[in-house]
Amino acid sequence: MDKVKVFEGLLNKFETDEIRNYCTDMIKEIPDYIFTIPSSTSFKHHNKTQCQPHGQIFHILMFAEVMNYVLGLEYVKEKTNERQRDCLRCTPIFHDAIKCGLNGSQYTVHEHPMLAGEWVRNTSVEHDVDTDTKAYIARLCESHSGEWTSTKRSKTVLPKPENDEQFFCTYV
């Protein structure tokens, strides 16, 4: 499967070559299982389309479509630069990249936002970005569960959004 081709339409919306090339390289590193699983392995937290096979891809594309719409608004463009907007564009693709853990568990692992952040920080690619940019994108991924930070099945408490960008990535 050509992973990059799946996201070609999203990549075409990037405004900077630097972050587009980085995102393209990172897409190649996403575990294969992400391209076949439903977005909700328990069938509870996503719509019917996203709970079907390949639903995770639908989830990413829907998230990205809304993200791109909002990033194109005059108000948002006045408050952000091209690079910031492109980092935000990475989030729909990266936020669930390790959704079922590093080994592809049958179910979503509660810690997956933290695993996604770790994956962003630690993965080296040909068109890599600086550590501050990686940390920014990682934090967007880590806080994407919003106020739903805990579960009885895990001792891990996920971080809540701390700023407007993180809040935006949670509720889009």
Which functions belong to the PLM regions below?
Residues 1-104:
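Acidic/His-rich, divalent-metal-binding segments that scaffold phosphate/diphosphate chemistry
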Residues 56-59, 95, 110-113, 144-145:
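Histidine-centered active-site/metal-ligand motif
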Residues 60-66, 110-126:
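An active-site-proximal "capping" alpha-helix that borders the catalytic cofactor pocket
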Residues 103-108, 157:
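Metal-dependent catalytic cores of enzymes that make or break cyclic nucleotides
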